[in-house]
Regions:
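C-terminal helix-rich "cap/oligomerization" subdomain common to oxidoreductases
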Residues: 20-22, 58, 171, 247-248, ...
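Glycine-rich phosphate/pyrophosphate-binding beta-alpha loops
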Residues: 179-187
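C-terminal glycine/acidic-rich active-site capping loop/insertion
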Residues: 197-275
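Hydrophobic residues in well-ordered beta-strands that form the structural core
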Residues: 7, 46, 71-73, 102, ...
């Protein structure tokens, strides 16, 4: 009740009462639908990935500019609670200078037998979850990406990637790992962040985790080599407990409706978009280089 169904795209685009169109169709259709909508004077929200590659999205950006409308992508996972916690830890320097971030999602059921298993439709886990995790990292780390290396696996079928490992190096020296798996029967941590004065970990979606913080950096090396569980070792011997503090993860503000609250503010008051097209383009450029890296079996240098 209250919803209108249209028989064709043309009929929808001809409706003068519609000012914004949400495109939530298979990935390979986004560009054509978006450009048609923008040429009809409609603002466009695209489900992720916004396009099949950066070139397609650049065409969409040009259409938005030519027709005086806005274009954005539904990168709503910027408001996920786990991400907001890790972003707060990073922003507030709770671990000192961060040198490593690992972000992953893992399951054990493979990819469902839908269009997401078809290459022609833009299936695969890099397009499905990878674009979310890449967007989160780029929104967190204020530094250009200078290298990309990707490994894909095809475990449950051979058409699209169902397991992904993507390594990014940032200009500030920080490294990041994005990992998506669909054949994992023991899960690794959702988030792992290592800094010079502490480490933070979120185990799973239930937000269980902790921070281990350094409170005394004065390492007192023993006169004799300690005998550890891995054998005699000075380097791998555990720190004394009085030099470390285990603390709970901080709270973080989460507004699940913020994406659409922002869009209303853009429409009513001309506010800036929360998910800017330039940010989406940057993520798509990383996706493109991931495919190149896997094909060439090589690290790809860049400045994105």
């Amino acid at each position: 009740e209250g919803l209108i169904a249209y028989k064709t795209l043309e009929e929808l685009l001809a409706d003068k009462d519609i000012d914004t169109v949400l495109i939530a169709t298979p990935n390979n259709t986004h560009k054509d639908y978006a450009i048609a909508a923008m040429r009809a004077g409609k603002n466009v929200i695209c489900e992720k990935p916004a396009a099949m590659n950066a070139g397609e999205f650049a065409e969409m950006m040009a259409a938005a500019k030519e027709n005086g409308v806005f274009l954005t992508a539904h990168q709503n996972r910027r408001m996920d609670a786990d991400y907001r916690i890790m972003k707060r830890i990073y922003d507030e320097n709770m671990l000192g200078e961060v040198f490593r971030i690992e972000s992953r999602v893992q399951g054990s059921r493979g990819i469902a037998d839908t269009w997401r298993r078809k290459k022609e439709f833009g299936g695969g886990m890099l397009y499905d979850w990878g674009v979310h995790l890449i967007d989160q990292l780029l929104y967190m780390v204020n530094s250009p990406v200078v290298s990309v290396y990707a490994e894909f696996q095809y475990i449950s079928q051979q058409e699209v990637d169902d397991n992904v490992r993507l390594s990014l190096t940032f200009q500030n020296g920080m490294s990041a790992l994005v990992e998506i798996g669909t054949c994992n029967y023991i899960m690794l941590p959702l988030w792992y962040m290592a800094g010079k004065t502490g480490t933070a970990q979120i185990d799973y979606w239930n937000l269980e985790g902790r921070m281990n913080l350094l409170i005394d950096n004065d390492i007192k090396f023993e006169d004799e080599i300690p005998n550890t569980l891995v054998g005699p070792s000075i380097t791998l011997a555990p720190r004394s407990e009085d030099t470390m503090q285990v603390v709970p993860l901080p709270a973080a503000e989460v507004d699940k409706g913020y994406f659409y609250h922002n869009l209303l503010d853009v429409l009513d008051n001309g506010t800036e978009l929360w998910v800017k097209p330039e940010e989406v383009l940057r993520s798509m450029q990383i996706v493109d280089l991931a495919f190149v890296s896997f094909k060439e079996k090589n690290v790809i240098t860049c400045n994105i």
